[in-house]
Amino acid sequence: LDVVHEDKTLPVLRNVMRNFYSPLKASDPYLQFVFLTGITKFSQLSIFSELNNLTNISMFPEFGGICGITKEEMLTQMKDYVERLAKANEWTYEEAVAELTQQYDGYHFTWPSPDIFNPFSLLNAFNVNRIENYWFSSGTPTYLIEMLRKFNVMPADIGNMQTLASDFDAPTENMASITPLLYQSGYVTIKDFDRPTLLYTLDIPNKEIRVGLMDSLLPNYVNMRKEAGNTTIAKMYRALYNDDLDEMFRLLQEYLLTVPYCDNANSEGHYQQMLYIIFSLFGRYVEVEVRTPRGRVDVVMKTGKALYLFELKLNKSAEAAMKQIDLKDYASKFALAGLPIVKVG
């Protein structure tokens, strides 16, 4: 994936793959079944021009659970491992299932589809009896960051997108958007399907991917040593968990002071995306530019205890931001959320 998008290396890569797969055609009389899979999709003509009898089963519902571990498989064939994980972390069995589901579940490769767990992360969690972000441990996805810049995609734009199958189950050789790369790399997955319009809803699969992805993107927005940054974020999360908003915002202010000077640093949008990333690292529900009848809320964050409405003002007072929240009555949109509403300017 690091080189598949480069004009110089793509023809070489394509030729190597063509030479590798071409002998299959000559071996046809001796082959009863051939299964091909990979991380990205090439146009069939560019690689498999001689193999004209392939069937792409990527989005066939009957094969929806073929690559991964379904929830049913985990609860039956891996029940002993779930119980062992629960005991090691002093959880009930139900709490362990909920933690595993939130962290590693959520993949769908067609619709309808069973819930699919990331097998690599799930098996690692069972091996050491700890729930952590294993999928990103191999390194930062530099190619993804480069593609996000190329297509001018903001962190908050990743996920919750509606698109046709032809726009994401498509070759990545000459992408017109970043959607095929996000889907085929596992950063977004199918979450819903609208049959009348044939539109699929794509979103980030689970907490592991959201937190790992945002952690990779954060250095592009702040100039802080990673160790110090992670420590500050952990302290912010603990303050939020303890309802100590004064401490959380003190830490947040300290964090924002690390933003280096750049062209984007003089725009509210830069800080909006930064807050989106930081709050996503908390593992919380967060949205930006949330529409209300009288305007848009810059950032909305939801926890188990409250709903936070953020209005951002650059080179203006916090009072001006709070005044706008009240003047445009942003809170009324969330009156039925069943949570206390906290306004932040």
Give residue spans per PLM region:
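Hydrophobic/aromatic beta-strand patches that form the interior of the parallel beta-sheet core
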Residues: 35, 308-310, 342-344
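Nucleic-acid nuclease catalytic cores
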Residues: 318, 322, 331-345
